[in-house]
Amino acid sequence: MESRARCIFLLLLQILTRARGDILPSVCGHSRDAGKIVGGQDALEGQWPWQVSLWITEDGHICGGSLIHEVWVLTAAHCFRRSLNPSFYHVKVGGLTLSLLEPHSTLVAVRNIFVHPTYLWADASSGDIALVQLDTPLRPSQFTPVCLPAAQTPLTPGTVCWVTGWGATQERDMASVLQELAVPLLDSEDCEKMYHTQGSSLSGERIIQSDMLCAGYVEGQKDSCQGDSGGPLVCSINSSWTQVGITSWGIGCARPYRPGVYTRVPTYVDWIQRILAENHSDAYGYHSSASAAYQMLLPVLLAVALPGSL
């Protein structure tokens, strides 16, 4: 009997511990039905509600990003080449334009910046991923998070996904309204071959690394561009928008044989979860419901499973 009670206790404890570590929202990736984005179109209000703009406080928009939680933004590491000082940055949440006068938008201060340790601060580097911790939590009415994929999510070439951002609509002109663009995922080896054609100066070097993902068109004409960096590449998976890529780099914009290159998000899901778990809740004076349940039920479980232990 005692052995059975111990087994029950350990099982319940394991369940609660797992729940305690599940920080990402259970509801995500929902928007209105559905592209710098070259060859794209204006997005509609509420269509990509996780899209945010990363601002340098004095200069305005520099990169895109995506809300994955009420205090967490996913973006690219190269967006922080100027400084890793959180006080340099704000995040604009809500709205379709970069105007601070737009209704339902707000500018939020940044508390912390976490850049992946493998990023080399060089063009086309692996590890081009970063997490931004907001200084204050967003209210439920202010945000809808994008879903994150499982680490083993298959990314099938030919799958049509969407990239969004305020970057250039040509190689020079910035967009005033959030742009959206449908792009097919590409096979990594095919993408590698494309970057070694048409007079590439990178011949002999491996360009597309295992943590990178290509999307776009062989003929060019449609692509993400400067100012879109850090923004999301999302696919519809199980009827929810799931972020599979982060706009990372490319050569020019919408050029033939030069598709956009994105950080492959499934590669970094474990890192994202670890950073969130290590820097969650206590600093804001609140606790997750799972954590509260854990604290309330643990004494009860001990009393039931281990009589006389309390």
UniProtKB/Swiss-Prot annotation:
<keyword id="KW-0865">Zymogen</keyword>
<feature type="disulfide bond">
    <location>
        <begin position="191"/>
        <end position="214"/>
    </location>
</feature>
<dbReference type="InterPro" id="IPR009003">
    <property type="entry name" value="Peptidase_S1_PA"/>
</dbReference>
<feature type="signal peptide">
    <location>
        <begin position="1"/>
        <end position="21"/>
    </location>
</feature>
<keyword id="KW-1003">Cell membrane</keyword>
<keyword id="KW-0645">Protease</keyword>
<feature type="propeptide" description="Activation peptide">
    <location>
        <begin position="22"/>
        <end position="36"/>
    </location>
</feature>
<dbReference type="InterPro" id="IPR043504">
    <property type="entry name" value="Peptidase_S1_PA_chymotrypsin"/>
</dbReference>
<dbReference type="GO" id="GO:0006508">
    <property type="term" value="P:proteolysis"/>
</dbReference>
<dbReference type="InterPro" id="IPR001314">
    <property type="entry name" value="Peptidase_S1A"/>
</dbReference>
<keyword id="KW-0739">Sodium transport</keyword>
<dbReference type="InterPro" id="IPR018114">
    <property type="entry name" value="TRYPSIN_HIS"/>
</dbReference>
<feature type="disulfide bond">
    <location>
        <begin position="161"/>
        <end position="235"/>
    </location>
</feature>
<keyword id="KW-1015">Disulfide bond</keyword>
<dbReference type="InterPro" id="IPR001254">
    <property type="entry name" value="Trypsin_dom"/>
</dbReference>
<keyword id="KW-0732">Signal</keyword>
<dbReference type="GO" id="GO:0017080">
    <property type="term" value="F:sodium channel regulator activity"/>
</dbReference>
<keyword id="KW-0813">Transport</keyword>
<keyword id="KW-0325">Glycoprotein</keyword>
<dbReference type="Pfam" id="PF00089">
    <property type="entry name" value="Trypsin"/>
</dbReference>
<keyword id="KW-0720">Serine protease</keyword>
<dbReference type="InterPro" id="IPR033116">
    <property type="entry name" value="TRYPSIN_SER"/>
</dbReference>
<keyword id="KW-0449">Lipoprotein</keyword>
<keyword id="KW-0378">Hydrolase</keyword>
<feature type="disulfide bond">
    <location>
        <begin position="63"/>
        <end position="79"/>
    </location>
</feature>
<feature type="disulfide bond">
    <location>
        <begin position="225"/>
        <end position="253"/>
    </location>
</feature>
<feature type="domain" description="Peptidase S1">
    <location>
        <begin position="37"/>
        <end position="277"/>
    </location>
</feature>
<protein>
    <recommendedName>
        <fullName>Serine protease 30</fullName>
        <ecNumber>3.4.21.-</ecNumber>
    </recommendedName>
</protein>
<dbReference type="GO" id="GO:0004252">
    <property type="term" value="F:serine-type endopeptidase activity"/>
</dbReference>
<keyword id="KW-0915">Sodium</keyword>
<feature type="lipid moiety-binding region" description="GPI-anchor amidated serine">
    <location>
        <position position="281"/>
    </location>
</feature>
<feature type="active site" description="Charge relay system">
    <location>
        <position position="229"/>
    </location>
</feature>
<dbReference type="GO" id="GO:0098552">
    <property type="term" value="C:side of membrane"/>
</dbReference>
<dbReference type="GO" id="GO:0008236">
    <property type="term" value="F:serine-type peptidase activity"/>
</dbReference>
<keyword id="KW-0472">Membrane</keyword>
<feature type="active site" description="Charge relay system">
    <location>
        <position position="78"/>
    </location>
</feature>
<feature type="propeptide" description="Removed in mature form">
    <location>
        <begin position="282"/>
        <end position="310"/>
    </location>
</feature>
<feature type="glycosylation site" description="N-linked (GlcNAc...) asparagine">
    <location>
        <position position="279"/>
    </location>
</feature>
<keyword id="KW-0406">Ion transport</keyword>
<feature type="active site" description="Charge relay system">
    <location>
        <position position="128"/>
    </location>
</feature>
<comment type="similarity">
    <text>Belongs to the peptidase S1 family.</text>
</comment>
<dbReference type="GO" id="GO:0005886">
    <property type="term" value="C:plasma membrane"/>
</dbReference>
